Amino acid sequence: MLDTLLINIGQLLTMDQEDGLLRREAMNTLPVIENGAVGIENGVITFVGTAEEAKGLQAKEVIDCGGKMVSPGLVDPHTHLVFGGSRENEIALKLQGVPYLEILEQGGGILSTVNATKQASKEELVQKAKFHLDRMLSFGVTTVEAKSGYGLDDETEWKQLEATAQLQKEHPIDLVSTFLGAHAVPKEYKGRSKEFLQWMLDLLPEMKEKQLAEFVDIFCETGVFSVEESKEFLLKAKELGFDVKIHADEIDPLGGAEAAAEIGAASADHLVGASDKGIEMLANSNTVATLLPGTTFYLNKESFARGRKMIDEGVAVALATDFNPGSCPTENIQLIMSIAMLKLKMTPEEVWNAVTVNSSYAINRGEVAGKIRVGRKADLVLWDAYNYAYVPYHYGVSHVNTVWKNGNIAYTRGEQSWSTATI
């Protein structure tokens, strides 16, 4: 007997069309079962089909979804989850048009967050991050990548990674940990970036032994780390058994996209300034282009990543919030979906695939997350919407009704608009 059976699902978005990364037309295709049903047992999906096919199934609880839509839990593959403080004091500078790199030089930007994170205890960081994770869950996210990078020293970086490990045990959302010690060059290492990177590399063996990080990332940008420094650093991390990511071409077109494809990074993120050659190389690689339009929006910039061109040329595109205290302080992945549709010229179908299938592959979770398939975790979202286009169309609010994580209700609105029923 099933534990739970969901019936009367108006649109069941399985996202289950083909294995591997989705590109071109596959990104613009959504497998939808009309009047669908999903069966759950021991936290695992055991039935996917139509309500007609589900007749005769026995379940301890049968939930009538009222003709509303059900999707997989969403995947946010790029966040800076664990940090201290906030940076609302920088809003005025941004409105005046002060460039981020200038704010950084004044001791603001990431350096401000670094100081607040250093001063916070691990438990304070955990409790703050739980608050943000709860919000992410309420927006339909069930898997999140979490970066360190607000320490720029060994003690604080360890503290961030240990906080993430504790959160993995204490919060329903699945977390994927990334070490971003190479997020900026500390003042004491100004002009000595190679020495700083070697210091970060020296931390990796113990980090690997303690399994505190799965990925290693670096901020490849003017005034921070060069393309050559980034490639050398990430290749050494790969030799130690880590998968790698790269903050690439966010501000200047340095060649970060090309570097990511060349070294086989799991993802290249931002890519606002990615060159035509970089896009071509990404299209011919298995590196996911994780686009972060919420950051461009919040920084009030006119030029967004060329998402339309990337998809048309065969790049596997994912979307993420880039949740962080400075350049994108939002946990709302649904808002990111809307911005991507409007500013990156992505279709609703492409947007949905970019926050499920491709985003899961960007963090090596393509075989366990992002799809509704028999044998996978029952990470499901019931939406207060009757079709998938409505979610990115009606922007600025959350359309989530209920979230199941491993078959258990992890979030629901104050009142449930569905009721239990029998077949």
From Swiss-Prot:
It catalyses: 4-imidazolone-5-propanoate + H2O = N-formimidoyl-L-glutamate. It is found in: Cytoplasm. Coiled coil: none annotated. Signal peptide: none annotated. GO terms for molecular function: imidazolonepropionase activity; iron ion binding; zinc ion binding. Fe(3+) binds at H78, H80, H247, D322. Its cofactor is Zn(2+); Fe(3+). N-formimidoyl-L-glutamate binds at Y150, N324, G326. Zn(2+) binds at H78, H80, H247, D322. 4-imidazolone-5-propanoate binds at R87, Y150, H183, E250, S327. Pathway: Amino-acid degradation; L-histidine degradation into L-glutamate; N-formimidoyl-L-glutamate from L-histidine: step 3/3. It comes from the Bacteria. Belongs to the metallo-dependent hydrolases superfamily. HutI family. This is Imidazolonepropionase. It comes from Bacillus thuringiensis (strain Al Hakam). The lineage of its organism: Bacteria, Bacillati, Bacillota, Bacilli, Bacillales. The gene is hutI.
